Amino acid sequence: MTKSELIERLASQQSHIPAKAVEDAVKEMLEHMASTLAQGERIEIRGFGSFSLHYRAPRTGRNPKTGDKVDLEGKYVPHFKPGKELRDRANIYGN
């Protein structure tokens, strides 16, 4: 599901709210989550999961075209850990 599809689905389920308001709310929520993570804070949504930053240590990689070694700097990457309810629902779908 893309962001546009999410906005469309929410707008159709909440017909009393204008589609533009739904779009603005979704965009604002995602922007707030991104800025919170960028500040190094953790986001927890009970039953859904948590977002945090994990550190990737510096390492030596390879250029896929040439095979040359490339030194990669350490960096923080976003990480999502699903909550129990989300894991359980995914298992129902997967079975």
UniProtKB/Swiss-Prot annotation:
The gene is ihfB. Belongs to the bacterial histone-like protein family. Keywords: DNA recombination, DNA-binding, Transcription, Transcription regulation, Translation regulation. GO terms for molecular function: DNA binding; structural constituent of chromatin. This protein is one of the two subunits of integration host factor, a specific DNA-binding protein that functions in genetic recombination as well as in transcriptional and translational control. GO terms for biological process: DNA recombination; regulation of DNA-templated transcription; regulation of translation. This is Integration host factor subunit beta. Residues 57-76 are annotated as: Disordered. Heterodimer of an alpha and a beta chain. Signal peptide: none annotated. Pfam families: Bac_DNA_binding (PF00216). PROSITE patterns: HISTONE_LIKE. Gene3D superfamilies: IHF-like DNA-binding proteins.
